[in-house]
Structures are given as C-alpha cells and as structure tokens.
A protein has these predicted regions:
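Short, basic/aromatic recognition patches
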Residues: 1-14
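Short helix-to-loop capping/linker segments positioned immediately adjacent to catalytic or ligand/cofactor-binding
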Residues: 3, 18-22, 104-109
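Covalent nucleotidyltransferase core used to form phosphodiester bonds in nucleic acids
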Residues: 4, 39-43, 47-52
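Short beta-strand segments
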Residues: 11-45, 59-63, 72-75
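Short, structured beta-strand-loop surface elements
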Residues: 46-124
C-alpha cells in the first residue's frame, strides 16, 4: 500500500505551503527527498519560507509540477529547520535523486562560503 509519505517523497516537486502571520498561505514548489519518516528540502537560509517556518512550523505539502500546480490534495505537516551539516546531506541526496540538475544546484550552492539551510518535514497523522 502506498502511503502519502511515499507519494510525496517520490514526487519530482513538492508544493510547500507556509503561512504568513495573518494566515495567508504562501505556496512554493521545491525539490524534495525522503529521509526515513521525514521529507527534506534544501533552501537558502534567507528565503521567506525559512523566516515563516522559524515563526511557525505549520505547513501543508502536496505533490506538484515544476510551476507549482498541485497534483494531489494538501497534507498537514510540521516543518523544522535543520543544521547546516544536514543541509549538506540533503544537497547530496538531491544530487542522487535529480542527477545533472542536482549537481548544477550543488555546484552553485558550494561556490564561495555561502550558508546553506534545510527543512525537515514530518506529516501530521
């Protein structure tokens, strides 16, 4: 039996919806990898989604296309910010999943001494 975690972890893109202070949803299509019972996303530490997750970890996730068109119903989840070391592991996992596209992102991310961030996402049962 395929679980929502299986579907989301295998998706090419994940629609990660965070929420502003006033409750306004902010959907963002992102690459995703599965790590055990958690989904993981790599991002820049100054991204708006990081700021919103820092304030409240309440998010919704759904599989989507490259431009963010959902391919399924949203699932409630809790997001947490991971360490920079975890961000490096997430970036390596993205290379494994996305091949050349992932390598290009890793190359750009590792140029210079730019900080990295990762988000861990746990589905709410």
């Amino acid at each position: 039996m395929t679980t929502p975690l299986d579907v989301l972890g295998q998706a090419d893109y994940l629609l990660l919806t965070t929420f502003k202070k006033d409750g306004t949803p902010v959907p963002t299509p992102v690459w995703v990898v599965r790590h055990g019972d958690e989904l993981r996303v790599w991002t820049a530490p100054d991204a708006g989604k990081v700021k919103r997750i820092r304030r409240s970890g309440k998010v919704q996730v759904a599989p989507c296309g490259m431009r963010g068109k959902p391919h399924g119903s949203p699932v409630d989840a809790v997001a947490t910010l991971l360490s920079e070391e975890d961000a490096d592991q997430v970036l390596d996992a993205l290379v494994q999943k996305y091949g050349l596209r992932g390598r290009m992102v890793r190359w750009g991310a590792r140029r210079g001494d730019r900080p990295r961030a990762a988000i861990g996402i746990t589905l709410v049962s």
